[in-house]
Amino acid sequence: MPGTNDFRSYVFDPARVDAAGKNVGQRVYWKLYAIENLVRVMAHSILTAQVGANWWAVAVDPGIQASVQRRRADYTNRPWHGTPGKHDIYYAFLSDLSKIIIANSHLFRPVIPDIDQWIARLEQVRLPRNIVGHMNWPHKTDRQRIDVVHADLQQLVQQLAASGTGLSIP
């Protein structure tokens, strides 16, 4: 729907709300989904290789661990809902993932030499991700930023795989 715009710019029409939602889902949301989950896979894989299978307990800040445990408890207390995943990393927000990478950048640097640039790029999509995640309309510049980070992250994953870095799903 190339002509779809933010429904809030028009007189209320439920069809415009649906069209805007479909547009965001088809053009933006799936890329954010991929970005966040590719970061999870890379972080898990690299930290498992560098620290070991118990990397979460060793390499993650206790404050992040506590936040994740609260989020996990929310799902445990409502078993009629699905859960984000088995590993704690699936309960971590994008901002948490960035903090984990920052705190362990020395472990990422041998595999991803420009890790500091990647941390900055993740920060560039954090707020646009929240806009989309909270069901709002992203600005054109934010959509373009998401497009570029998604494409570049796909390339990084391919480079890691080609270099022999084992990538595994947490």
How should each PLM-predicted stretch be described?
Residues 1-170:
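Amphipathic alpha-helical interface elements
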